[in-house]
């Protein structure tokens, strides 16, 4: 069984590399296809996470994309994003782990974008915006996600298309040994 898992991981990695090299661009990529690819990659890494697109996270991603496209300064951007994600005490996401990330979509297909999100530690609890606040908790298996696109610039000032992703997962108490 271990050998089969290793073989599956190698095949999936090869497929991702092939997709990265032959992708036709990121604008035709759907949230559902990214969610499916992220679920496959998480399973290949041994993580028990299923990514599911949801309107609430899509709206959060849309608001962040609008903020980023509006050329907000870094100092104001952090506080504005924190307010959008609403994870402080009494907030909508108070009891959810909340992750965000961005990726340049030009020349990246579904697997390429999903790989970037997974590779940037979207599964690490400590990388969640509120990971320290929820220390000692674990993320539920279902991870809800939403994405939005905006036009930005790379480090050289070239125009690029950027995808914002927002992922949430309910914070749960870890199961104690001997308890059901």
In which residue ranges do the predicted regions lie?
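Serine/threonine-rich low-complexity intrinsically disordered regions
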Residues: 13, 27-33, 54, 73-77, ...
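A well-ordered secondary-structure block
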Residues: 89-179
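N-terminal low-complexity, intrinsically disordered segments
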Residues: 2, 25, 103-104
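Bacterial Sec-dependent N-terminal signal peptides
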Residues: 1-11
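Ligand/cofactor pocket segment of small-molecule handling proteins
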Residues: 16
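C-terminal motif of bacterial Sec signal peptides marking the signal peptidase cleavage site
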Residues: 19-23
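Short, well-ordered surface patches within globular domains
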Residues: 26-91
């Amino acid at each position: 069984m271990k050998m089969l898992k290793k073989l599956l991981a190698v095949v999936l990695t090869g497929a991702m590399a092939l997709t990265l090299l032959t992708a036709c661009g990121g604008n035709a990529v759907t949230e559902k296809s990214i969610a499916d690819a992220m679920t496959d990659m998480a399973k290949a890494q041994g993580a028990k996470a299923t990514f599911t697109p949801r309107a609430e996270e899509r709206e959060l991603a849309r608001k962040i994309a609008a903020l980023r496209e509006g050329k907000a300064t870094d100092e104001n951007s952090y506080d504005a994003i924190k307010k959008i994600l609403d994870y402080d005490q009494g907030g909508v996401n108070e009891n959810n782990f909340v992750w965000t990330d961005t990726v340049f979509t030009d020349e990246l297909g579904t697997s390429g974008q999903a790989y970037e999100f997974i590779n940037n530690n979207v599964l690490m609890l400590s990388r969640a915006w509120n990971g320290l606040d929820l220390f000692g908790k674990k993320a539920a298996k279902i991870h809800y996600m939403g994405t939005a696109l905006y036009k930005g610039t790379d480090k050289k000032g070239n125009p690029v298309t950027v995808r914002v992703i927002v992922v949430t997962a309910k914070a749960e108490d870890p199961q104690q040994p001997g308890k059901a």
